[in-house]
Amino acid sequence: MRSLLVFRKIPSRIRLRNLRNNKPFCSQSQFPKESENPSQEQRLLVYGSTSEENPVTSKVSLLSAKPEQKDDASVIDVLLNRRNNPEAALRFYNWARPWRGSFEDGDVFWVLIHILVSSPETYGRASDLLIRYVSTSNPTPMASVLVSKLVDSAKSFGFEVNSRAFNYLLNAYSKDRQTDHAVDIVNQMLELDVIPFFPYVNRTLSALVQRNSLTEAKELYSRMVAIGVDGDNVTTQLLMRASLREEKPAEALEVLSRAIERGAEPDSLLYSLAVQACCKTLDLAMANSLLREMKEKKLCVPSQETYTSVILASVKQGNMDDAIRLKDEMLSDGISMNVVAATSLITGHCKNNDLVSALVLFDKMEKEGPSPNSVTFSVLIEWFRKNGEMEKALEFYKKMEVLGLTPSVFHVHTIIQGWLKGQKHEEALKLFDESFETGLANVFVCNTILSWLCKQGKTDEATELLSKMESRGIGPNVVSYNNVMLGHCRQKNMDLARIVFSNILEKGLKPNNYTYSILIDGCFRNHDEQNALEVVNHMTSSNIEVNGVVYQTIINGLCKVGQTSKARELLANMIEEKRLCVSCMSYNSIIDGFFKEGEMDSAVAAYEEMCGNGISPNVITYTSLMNGLCKNNRMDQALEMRDEMKNKGVKLDIPAYGALIDGFCKRSNMESASALFSELLEEGLNPSQPIYNSLISGFRNLGNMVAALDLYKKMLKDGLRCDLGTYTTLIDGLLKDGNLILASELYTEMQAVGLVPDEIIYTVIVNGLSKKGQFVKVVKMFEEMKKNNVTPNVLIYNAVIAGHYREGNLDEAFRLHDEMLDKGILPDGATFDILVSGQVGNLQPVRAASL
């Protein structure tokens, strides 16, 4: 329902006219001093006429009255008598204002506004008066108060309310950047069915968008649409920008679509915004279509920004052909390529592994422009790092300085990461020291070095770096201390780890869940369950919520210290109290814990509970179960698990195949083991060293050294290194086969690749040589053991003692017996049998009896 007030119909757009002879307000009158007998000039100035018969003759006394006698009512009477002559009314207002003072608080000002907006000749003056009033008032008057004054003065003095007065008031607020008041004015105008001028509304919408009051801008527009006011292209543009700022490109396109349905003709700016919206939705077909449409309609050549948007989207979608075509099209239109588009193209080339094209474009940028910026260098340096081309990365890093670009923390960190990954530790530390000295390294870079130092076991150097950071004003954060604390825990130095934890508290930093997880895990790794649980108590007493990471650490730790039942109980409590979103990781720890404790039935029960709780087992779950079942001679169940994995679409990985193959090899079922090995290869998996070792051991146990050696050769061909276990198994089998030459060659090869013989391989060789009567070589091995500080075990001593017995060297045999005792190695029954039989056979019953 429309307001009872009558509003004058006015054009939706106007051109404000400048005030002629516009002078600023001042404290002195701009008119001649009044006299007892006003001159013709005074009458003309005040009344607009020299006639004594002026319609307001009754008010002539006003000119000669004392200032204090000039009240608002008298001024209003004169103004009302000049309502048909707005310019005369304004002259009188300006004349009376110095005598009376400010009229803005009363009705005088608003009566004048109504008079001025009634004539096109004084529109501009009305607007200027309102602008001055709003901008000079302190505090800024409330919009609702001024609207009320407009409406009330119209009713009181018989004016038809002109919507122009409201719009000029809106203009005054929007020009003074009083956006909230401007919004209030629009809302009140809409309530009064007054149609706002769109240039003024657009200015208000623009202010709302600029300050990110996007929802408020949309709501204001919606209220206008509700009364049938749609706005113009500028309005549509502002609303599209609001949607794009909110990352709602589909909404922006919908705004444009509705505008077109209402008959709007999109201009070049709306096309550009539509292209940007399509790029954000990666609808490149539509974006390219809009570009063509812009050209066909000859609105304008797409701008650099528009072309850049489509190029960026094409690169993001991996469509480099389109991106390059658009770049060429842009250049042919006479539009230069900016650094954003050029850098995006370099990024695309790098992603396509086309480094040549990337560097060609970079060289062109250096020669012809646009000049590469820091982001351009970042893309290339990061690409070089990922591909291990660190010398090239360093070259571009130095080139930045030549071009006057200051490397950032990102560049330093990227190169340091690359050096560390490539095991170029000295280069990494050198660059770090340089950046640290120049102040370029921040806590982020320092934390990377701290982490690396601690992984290398260099916790002393890490601790020293913490001190240097503080002295340089680089405050270590919780991550810094976490790195050092983790380093101490890895070295099982829990006392130092606790000192670091205390430092965190002393520095006023707040330990996070990861901090506590490090300490808890460190305690469990040291089999210190009590202190681990004390750390948990410290968390709860400090009102720190224990999250899933910490709970998982506790469960995993309990399983490691043989408290798997307690871990399962904790898990059950957490599920009941809904304190943890249980994953298969928790159950995996429990299943593995039960297996290591020999509780296979409990492990299977935990698996069944896991499935009952709706948690899907993963490959780790199945591998743990199959490994345990195989080691407990339950191959049928292990194969059932394998079949279940396949039925559920869980692919076997190398550890899973390894568990089954090892199980079959230990049972000498080499046919099944070989079948699984073939299946593994068909799946495209690469066998691991443990799998090869299991197969070699299996064939060795069957005496099939040909097959064992074939696997050894394949292992080397696949690029895998043999470990001590591999060589021990092969040498043992070859010695049993009597192939001493090949066994000796493998032993030499083993030492050549840097493997140091241990007690086990010495035992195998000594026993093998002893059984073949190679006593001289046995003694040689025995001496080599001592030289390498490997203590012979009782089996080796027995073999050497037996050899001396067979050689008739009983004194040396007894000396070795005494040596065993001196080294704390207890002789076994075989030792005594050798020595006793030797004494009796040599008619030394007394010595034999003493044994």
From Swiss-Prot:
Pfam families: PPR, PPR_1, PPR_2. Its main location: mitochondrion. It comes from the Eukaryota. Gene3D superfamilies: Tetratricopeptide repeat domain (1.25.40.10). PPR repeats lie at residues 162-196, 197-231, 232-266, 267-301, 303-337, 338-372, 373-407, 408-438, 442-476, 477-511, 512-546, 547-577, 583-617, 618-652, 653-687, 688-722, 723-757, 758-792, 793-827. It is found in: Mitochondrion. GO terms for cellular component: mitochondrion. Keywords: Mitochondrion, Repeat, Transit peptide. PANTHER family: ATPASE EXPRESSION PROTEIN 3, OS10G0484300 PROTEIN. Belongs to the PPR family. P subfamily. This is Pentatricopeptide repeat-containing protein At3g54980, mitochondrial. It comes from Arabidopsis thaliana (Mouse-ear cress).
